Amino acid sequence: MAPKAGKKPAEKKPVEEKKAEEVPAEKKPKAGKKLPKDAGADKKKKKSKKSVETYKIYIFKVLKQVHPDIGISSKSMGIMNSFINDIFEKLAQESSRLARINKKPTITSREIQTAVRLVLPGELAKHAVSEGTKAVTKFTSN
């Protein structure tokens, strides 16, 4: 391309003048004029929190039945919740194993009852079986 006739060749300026010209060009705009980073996020739907199922309310209800005057700390409640999850996981694994051994496609109350007898020790297993039987009877009668 040929240079335009109206343009003059660029003049060389001293270094100090160049620095003085660059500083105003680098100024940041005022904070009031900036758009917030989340301006576009208002249009998007907010993620709903994942609901986590816990046994905390049931633990608390049982505690109040047994000892109405005693409370429980949140850390202790978390430990109890983990304990119940672990026990239920062991019972589920054992009942699943029993169903597989007996070549049954379904886990019934009988597999659960046998798993309780295998997983829980002595007297605790007896009480759990009697309470479980009572709960199943109550459920089927309604």
From Swiss-Prot:
- Basic and acidic residues bias: where? 8-42
Tissue specificity as recorded in UniProt: Ubiquitous. Highest level in shoots, fruits and young flower buds, including petals, anthers and ovules.
List locations, semicolon-separated: Nucleus; Chromosome
N6-acetyllysine PTM positions read: 7, 33-34
Q: Which family does it belong to?
A: Belongs to the histone H2B family.
UniProt gene name? H2B-1
The protein depicted here goes by the name: Histone H2B.1
Positions the record marks as coiled coil are none
Q: How is it modified after translation?
A: Can be acetylated to form H2BK6ac, H2BK33ac and H2BK34ac.
Per the record, the covalent cross-link Glycyl lysine isopeptide (Lys-Gly) (interchain with G-Cter in ubiquitin) lies at 138
Q: According to its UniProt entry, what is the function of this protein? A: Core component of nucleosome. Nucleosomes wrap and compact DNA into chromatin, limiting DNA accessibility to the cellular machineries which require DNA as a template. Histones thereby play a central role in transcription regulation, DNA repair, DNA replication and chromosomal stability. DNA accessibility is regulated via a complex set of post-translational modifications of histones, also called histone code, and nucleosome remodeling.
Q: Identify the PROSITE patterns for this entry.
A: HISTONE_H2B (PS00357)
